[in-house]
């Protein structure tokens, strides 16, 4: 690999793993999506930015190097998402707050500071995600809800809006009507603790965490994609 890095590693950093092999077919609008992701991520977080690029085409690499210019840029062959995450997290000291995201997320202003409030405000936090979806309550939530049953207030209901679920379905290519029907019988879980309210879910697609907390569960793997729920479940089992 090759890249650019600062002389001193920061105590907080937002990181994204990019992948754009070409601009044909499925990928024909992907460059614009990645640009929107990275710009909104940086605009909403007053912290340094790191990009790990997994063997993308020149169009993206040129933009990253010449226009976007992240604080840390690593240009790698395609090692896969999980291996890239393992390598990134391993660069930083255990107390570093690191955010890791897919390259197709859209961030709202203030997303970083609000996420850090939850990370520091709740005890024994594994991950904090800035985007909830009702389907994600189906896995990796048992430790969170077990803790909340004795230490906080739990609420169940439909708090995630239909528009937010519609946006989620559109972003992952699931028919909207089919998705809304699937989640209609499910419920969101919210936890109130020490003046804060959070959904009882977080997942691999986008999160912030302490590097040392998640390092044992970041694995090198020969697979480019897939199997990532095991990361969420391992974090949850850790308590």
Where does each model-flagged region fall?
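C-terminal catalytic/acceptor-binding lobe
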Residues: 1-10, 30, 179-239
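Conserved catalytic core of nucleotide-sugar-dependent glycosyltransferases
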Residues: 112-213
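A conserved acidic beta->alpha catalytic loop
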Residues: 40, 44, 52-61
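Active-site nucleotide-sugar/metal-binding loop of Leloir-type enzymes
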Residues: 86-97
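Conserved donor nucleotide-binding strand/loop of the catalytic core
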Residues: 64-79
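N-proximal low-complexity "stem/linker" segments adjacent to membrane-targeting elements
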Residues: 1-40
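The conserved acidic donor/metal-binding loop of glycosyltransferases
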Residues: 102-106
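Acidic helix N-cap motif at the loop->helix transition within catalytic regions
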Residues: 25-26, 58-66
């Amino acid at each position: 690999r090759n890249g650019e890095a600062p002389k001193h590693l920061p105590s907080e950093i937002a990181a994204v793993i990019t992948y754009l092999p070409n601009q044909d077919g499925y990928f024909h609008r992907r460059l614009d999506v990645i640009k929107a992701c990275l710009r909104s991520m940086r605009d909403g977080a007053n912290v340094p930015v790191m990009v790990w690029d997994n063997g993308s085409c020149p169009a993206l690499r040129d933009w990253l190097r010449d226009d976007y210019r992240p604080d840390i840029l690593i240009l790698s062959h395609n090692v896969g998402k999980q291996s890239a995450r393992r390598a990134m997290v391993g660069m930083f000291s255990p107390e570093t707050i690191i955010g890791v995201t897919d390259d197709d997320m859209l961030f709202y202003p203030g997303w970083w500071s609000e996420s850090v409030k939850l990370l520091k405000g709740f005890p024994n936090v594994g991950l904090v995600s800035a985007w909830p979806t009702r389907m994600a309550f189906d896995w990796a939530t048992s430790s969170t809800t077990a803790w909340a049953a004795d230490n906080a207030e739990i609420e169940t209901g439909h708090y995630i809006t239909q528009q937010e679920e519609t946006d989620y379905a559109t972003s992952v290519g699931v028919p909207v009507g089919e998705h809304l029907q699937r989640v209609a019988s499910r419920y969101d879980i919210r936890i109130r603790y020490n003046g804060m309210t959070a959904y009882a879910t977080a997942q691999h697609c986008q999160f912030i965490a302490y590097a040392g907390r998640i390092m044992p569960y970041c694995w090198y793997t020969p697979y480019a994609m897939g199997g990532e729920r095991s990361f969420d479940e391992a974090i949850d089992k850790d308590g």
